[in-house]
Amino acid sequence: MSFDITENFDPRQYVLDKRFENVGRIFAFASGKGGVGKSSLSTAAALSLAKQGKKTGLLDFDFYGASDHLFLGAELSFPEENAGILPLEAAFGLKFMSIAAFTGEQGVPMRGPDVTNAILELLAVTIWGDLDYLIIDMPPGIGDEVLDLIRYIRKSEILIISTPSVVSVRVVKRLLDVFVNLNMKVAGVVENMVSDEAGKRSLSEAELSAADSVPFLGRIPVCPDLEKAIGKPEELLKTSFVKKTGQIISGII
């Protein structure tokens, strides 16, 4: 019986495994649709961990809507090269990498294989070094970019973001089904943008998690001070939004 040892073998996987071998845990923030606050939550979690003195990285992989740098107030510049590329440094020693470091504020007109190759290239050349935690801001939905990320970053733990909207929750249920069928580790579900009025529509914890094996991590109320704190890390840390996000992330680390 003969077989081809190159079948289904991608040498880049070995490189990626080496890149992340000194990263303690990797949390990938995902959502079934846009507009649920995934990027703000990703940034808040990373800032909270960095402020605690944890060695933390933040990877903004929302190819078509990168915005984490806006929350951080980080100036984008082409990363320094040293046998790879080094992440930018943001507030509190947070290591930060974004597709926007290469594209600026321009759109990225890529699709299919081009997106996959760009993802693999950026993952393979970025040198994170020793990290306690890496937070990944994933693209919304379940397209090629998301599937590629969870395929190649095997240590990922998925954290799913929803809102009280019935539409959002139903999309999250479908997303959960996909991740469970792919045998991905799902850290839990967070419900964002909860208000008194929205709370009347908010589904039960069992409905949000959709499966006994997927914990419901908590609800984050609407924060009226969040908008004016964008771009000011010190001010962001004072908001109820970041404080609540920090409590949730601390509960799973």
Which residues make up each language-model segment?
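Phosphate-binding loop that captures ATP/GTP phosphates
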Residues: 55-105, 109, 116, 120
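Extreme N-terminal, non-catalytic leader segments
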Residues: 1-32
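Conserved beta-strand scaffold positions in the cores of enzyme catalytic domains, especially
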Residues: 25-26, 58, 94-96, 216-219
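Conserved catalytic-core segment of NTP-binding enzymes
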Residues: 125, 133-228
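Walker A/P-loop phosphate-binding motif and the immediately C-terminal alpha-helix
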Residues: 25-62
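C-terminal boundary of histidine-terminating zinc-finger modules
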Residues: 230-242
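Cytosolic-facing regulatory segments adjacent to core modules
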Residues: 102-143
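Helical mechanochemical/support elements of P-loop NTPase systems and associated helical scaffolds
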Residues: 19-22, 41, 45, 63-64, ...
